[in-house]
Amino acid sequence: MSWQSYVDDHLMCDVEGNHLTAAAILGQDGSVWAQSAKFPQLKPQEIDGIKKDFEEPGFLAPTGLFLGGEKYMVIQGEQGAVIRGKKGPGGVTIKKTNQALVFGFYDEPMTGGQCNLVVERLGDYLIESEL
């Protein structure tokens, strides 16, 4: 299965009639393995901030999480495994695997819980597959 099919079939899937607004799988170096059409262009310093927060949980909390130049308020995640951000009626979930970062962006009517489920389910599968 190609990385693009993971994005198309497993991240951009239908969840109770809703879909993520954007999704991607990136290498931990920030290289894009696959992405949806509306996934924002991330800056190197934004990837560095994400990596730093996974190493030092809470690093992004004072300044916020920036993705594609947009600021997200960091909300409770899972130390070293998941970063969650909120911006208005939407947000983002980022799941770290052994080799990758799985991103999912959502907006109403999709909920943060639905986004978490989709992103973390694929992330857990990749971890089990040692990816």
UniProtKB/Swiss-Prot annotation:
One of its GO terms (cellular component) is plasmodesma. Disruption phenotype: Delayed germination. In young seedlings, excessive numbers of root hairs, abnormal raised cotyledons, elongated hypocotyls, and elongated cells in the hypocotyl. Defects in rosette leaf and inflorescence development. GO terms for molecular function: actin binding. It comes from the Eukaryota. Induction: Down-regulated by light. Occurs in many kinds of cells as a complex with monomeric actin in a 1:1 ratio. Binds to actin monomers and regulates the organization of the actin cytoskeleton. At high concentrations, profilin prevents the polymerization of actin, whereas it enhances it at low concentrations. At low concentrations, associates with the poly-proline motif of formins to enhance actin filament elongation rate. Binds ACT1, ACT7 and ACT11 and inhibits actin polymerization. Coordinates the stochastic dynamic properties of actin filaments by modulating formin-mediated actin nucleation and assembly during axial cell expansion. Binds G-actin and poly-L-proline in vitro. This is Profilin-1. It comes from Arabidopsis thaliana.
